[in-house]
Amino acid sequence: MIDTIEKEDTIISEEEAAQYDRQIRLWGLDAQKRLRGSRVLLVGLRGLGAEVAKNLILAGVKGLTLLDHEQVTEESRRAQFLIPVDADGQNHAQASLERAQFLNPMVEVKADTEPVESKPDDFFFQFDAVCLTRCSRDLMVRVDQLCASRNIKVFCGDVYGYNGYMFSDLGQEYHYVEEKPKVVKGSNEANDGPEAKKPKIDPNETTMVKKTISFCSLKEALEVDWTTEKAKSSLKRIPADYFLLQVLLKFRTDKGRDPQPDSFAEDSQLLLQIRDDVLETMGLSSDLLPNTFVSYCFSEMSPVCAVVGGVLGQEIVKALSQRDAPHRNFFFFDGLKGSGVVDYFSSK
């Protein structure tokens, strides 16, 4: 697994150097080497999964496994550009494979049609990063805990109508490098004034700074104790999307599916009831998530998939290349407002 900045023994061929020339210029040869040595598991090949797959394949990871056991329907391919229009009834991963591989023949792209729930623990240990979409809360928590023991990076994400999120767990000690402007020492001449003696930033030179940051588990991030004074004082700045995520994950757990447009009336009432129950359990008022949320959280929307998939793909690339500061640990996107926010949640 790629777990330290020093591990850079992947060889980049001349053909690969030409293919990834722009990226090498952008984030450096060492970062591209780490990407080319990384294998990623992507679970869920709907609209969001397709966006993430595209971004990882174009970035140039070594291998990408597309895992999805469900069959293509007209509804499931509306936001999914990797699946042909005549693929109804086929498996999502298999139907996406040809177009995904065409994006970059240098990446090993595979399809896995088995349910992720049936996979043994050691299945996940062959990857450097695991990205989970359209998965239950229990499964995401299980995989996150498994991967933490092997320093495997875990990402989760979903799109619900106008809203979407991503979560990342990069471990207790995640190391990365960040490019900073170089600071030039001031003058030491006795006759120079105070301004000349002050250190200055040279805009033409940069230096690479090594940094370390810690992440909490998904379980800890979802189990914040909102009854504490510290948590209560922060409620005003907490995005409602965090509580929307809790409601939608509970809906998925209870119903085994996401809210469906063809059962809008029934699912809307159930969402409101789950909202009341979830927030009451947290010791919070249902006013934190107004009733109008039910009008905007059905199905995947292509533009929202593009935004969230772009951010999620970018964060996976950053984590594998160990270049630049990562989002810690949630990113929420609100399509109605056209805005995204990064926030950190932990029960500790």
From Swiss-Prot:
Pfam families: ThiF. GO terms for cellular component: cytoplasm; SUMO activating enzyme complex. It comes from Danio rerio. The heterodimer acts as an E1 ligase for sumo1, sumo2, and sumo3. It mediates ATP-dependent activation of sumo proteins followed by formation of a thioester bond between a sumo protein and a conserved active site cysteine residue on uba2/sae2. Belongs to the ubiquitin-activating E1 family. Heterodimer of sae1 and uba2/sae2. The heterodimer corresponds to the two domains that are encoded on a single polypeptide chain in ubiquitin-activating enzyme E1. Interacts with ube2i. One of its GO terms (molecular function) is SUMO activating enzyme activity. Keywords: Ligase, Nucleus, Ubl conjugation pathway. The keyword Nucleus applies. Pathway: Protein modification; protein sumoylation. It is found in: Nucleus. This is SUMO-activating enzyme subunit 1. One of its GO terms (biological process) is definitive hemopoiesis. SUPFAM superfamilies: Activating enzymes of the ubiquitin-like proteins. It comes from the Eukaryota.
